[in-house]
Amino acid sequence: MQLSFILTSSVFILLLEFVKASVISNPFKPNGNLKFKRGGGHNVAWDYDNNVIRGVNLGGWFVLEPYMTPSLFEPFQNGNDQSGVPVDEYHWTQTLGKEAASRILQKHWSTWITEQDFKQISNLGLNFVRIPIGYWAFQLLDNDPYVQGQVQYLEKALGWARKNNIRVWIDLHGAPGSQNGFDNSGLRDSYNFQNGDNTQVTLNVLNTIFKKYGGNEYSDVVIGIELLNEPLGPVLNMDKLKQFFLDGYNSLRQTGSVTPVIIHDAFQVFGYWNNFLTVAEGQWNVVVDHHHYQVFSGGELSRNINDHISVACNWGWDAKKESHWNVAGEWSAALTDCAKWLNGVNRGARYEGAYDNAPYIGSCQPMLDISQWSDEHKTDTRRYIEAQLDAFEYTGGWVFWSWKTENAPEWSFQTLTYNGLFPQPVTDRQFPNQCGFH
């Protein structure tokens, strides 16, 4: 009897210790996702359950995009002839050569985003930035034309973020061979990320990022590392992509880091990733990044404003059902695809019927200058922004694309805010509860 009691007590104590240890290292959300991993002196500096991300992307800084900074690409244009204009950063650096490209980019990196931008971002009520960067900032392939030097500015940015109480995702925006063929991957119309050594090189680059920015030195600032921006699921091998995500996750955790791992949804439907990288499989602190745009097909562009808002609201309902934490890591105010070179150099706009066999909807001319927008378009834009904010804040929050552009107002947080179209404060609503969440 006594021996039985001692054994029972011992089992109970062991069970209690196991439960305590599990709770300390694996505090679960009700849906089975992990909130934090505590212990070992580590705390994640962001509570994805209870805090709402309100942020901007620092686009066009370390990865050039022709529509964001056309002034860097227009010198190659000959009148209306765009045939000599590089279509992406790869061809831009290749055309200029390393010396000239480096000189121009050093000036660009030191001026496009400065400490003053971080102060403004904070003063406007934002708490977060997502920083896109290409693999070439960390490792060059043989014969790559890219130039390096981005990392010193990335590290300045992390310091400016810390000083202004802003949290950061470091987002690997371009992989060798390109993961999507978009110009914002560095290399347009290429889909070779999964060929040759490209996936392994990407993992090597991620390992460098993990060791530099995934540890204690930046744990108060970096609240996520995004393994890869917008891998184009429909043209990639999804089994290989999942293995890449798993390898990236394991690589980060093997460094001892508790930093959340961010995976983009690869343009799959809501819920696709629910059973991948789960606590049940021993993976934790995983966030799914969804991007929300409604301008990259003729069908989307032809929607009226009520339809645009309905789609945005449904995003919120669908995202809420997912088992992982999720964030709208990119979105914009765009109701047209009119920004010059948005669809790529030497490509027109669907809105004008000048690209992708899309039907003509209207002229792009007034859309390029916010002072020429009609009152109706301004109202529609404000309504659309507010609906998206409501939808995204129904879950983990939002990261607007982008903080600034040279002359693409639908894509510039600064321009929209200073013209009264983006709410200020960001919680202000002229059109409250459009989605009926409350």
UniProtKB/Swiss-Prot annotation:
Propeptide boundaries: 22-38
Gene3D superfamilies, per database record: Glycosidases
Activity control mechanisms: Binding of human antimicrobial peptide LL-37 decreases the catalytic activity, which leads to the decrease of cell adhesion.
Biological process, per Gene Ontology: adhesion of symbiont to host cell; cell-substrate adhesion; fungal-type cell wall organization; glucan catabolic process; glucan metabolic process; single-species biofilm formation in or on host organism; single-species biofilm formation on inanimate substrate
Result after altering residue 296 to A: Impairs catalytic activity
Subcellular location: Secreted, Cell wall
EC numbers, comma separated: 2.4.1.-, 3.2.1.58
Disulfide feature: 313-435, 338-364
Single annotated GO MF: transferase activity
GO CC field: cell surface; extracellular region; extracellular vesicle
InterPro entries xref list: Glyco_hydro_5, Glyco_hydro_5_CS, Glycoside_hydrolase_SF, Glycosyl_hydrolase_5
Residues given in the record as substrate binding sites: 65, 67, 230, 293, 300
Phenotypic effect of disruption: Leads to enhanced susceptibility to the commonly used antifungal, fluconazole, during biofilm growth only.
Domain of life: Eukaryota
The keyword Lyase is annotated on this UniProt entry: no
Residues forming the catalytic site: 230, 330
Keywords, alphabetical: Cell adhesion, Cell wall, Cell wall biogenesis/degradation, Cleavage on pair of basic residues, Disulfide bond, Glycosidase, Hydrolase, Secreted, Signal, Transferase, Virulence, Zymogen
Record's keyword annotation contains Phosphoprotein: no
Family of the protein in this entry: Belongs to the glycosyl hydrolase 5 (cellulase A) family.
Subunit composition and interactions: Monomer. Interacts with the human antimicrobial peptide LL-37.
Protein name, as recorded: Glucan 1,3-beta-glucosidase
Annotated organism of origin: Candida albicans (strain SC5314 / ATCC MYA-2876) (Yeast)
